[in-house]
Amino acid sequence: MESRKDITNQEEIWKMKPRRNLEDNDYLQTAHADEFDCPSELQHAQELFPQWHLPIKIAAVMASLTFLYTLLREVIHPLATSHQQYFYKIPILVINKVLPMVSITLLALVYLPGVIAAIVQVHNGTKYKKFPHWLDKWMLTRKQFGLLSLFFAVLHAIYTLSYAMRRSYRYKLLNWAYQQVQQNKEDAWIEHDVWRMEIYVSLGIVGLAILALLAVTSIPSVSDSLTWREFHYIQVHGRINFLTL
């Protein structure tokens, strides 16, 4: 009876079991959970933004190169040639020249693979042959390129609207007013400059609106509510795409 009581007592069995075996069992249970409970397909599906890696890298490289070129042209070159310091331009003016260049280049990368794919199909003589791996990967990331293009375009619009809030711009207005008084000019109106800026702003607003329309219709919940003809007209129709570009 005493031995049977010891055997049926769970606490005694736990104490009687060697510690090494307990650690081995814990290790096996952990290894079992890591190996079978989380397969490789699920681990791949849980990666952080896998389709955004390539577009973000390309956008970062383009933005860095464009920033360096603009910095050399707008700041370093005047400093080296005429000893004029324009470092105050870096936070707003230099950045605002980088944003539209990157945005329009990313937008071009959205529609360029479609043209390349058509050329490849003509070269192969059929549309049922698989595309090269690099082209297939590029076409799968067109949505991400388009959203990044919209992101840089919105930033460009915000930076442009902030021009009038800069302290340097206010000082320039005072200098222009003083120069106008010194030159005895009652009216500083320049017709072609006015028309040029009005057209620039108008086309920028229209382009941003169309780009936002394309981005909204690419959302799955919105695209599912559209018919195939409506989606094809907005996303694939060449006139809207090239008008945006």
From Swiss-Prot:
Q: Quick one: where is this thing mainly located?
A: membrane
Q: Which GO terms describe its cellular component?
A: endosome; plasma membrane
Transmembrane segment boundaries: 52-72, 100-120, 145-165, 199-219
Cellular location(s): Membrane
Q: Which residues form a coiled coil?
A: none
**Which keywords does this Swiss-Prot/TrEMBL entry list?**
Membrane, Transmembrane, Transmembrane helix
Membrane-protein topology: Multi-pass membrane protein
Q: Name one Pfam family in it.
A: Ferric_reduct
Taxonomically, which superkingdom? Eukaryota
InterPro entries attached to this UniProt entry: Fe3_Rdtase_TM_dom, STEAP_metalloreductase
Q: Which family does it belong to?
A: Belongs to the STEAP family.
Please report the name of this protein according to its UniProt entry: STEAP family member 1B
UniProt lists the gene as: STEAP1B
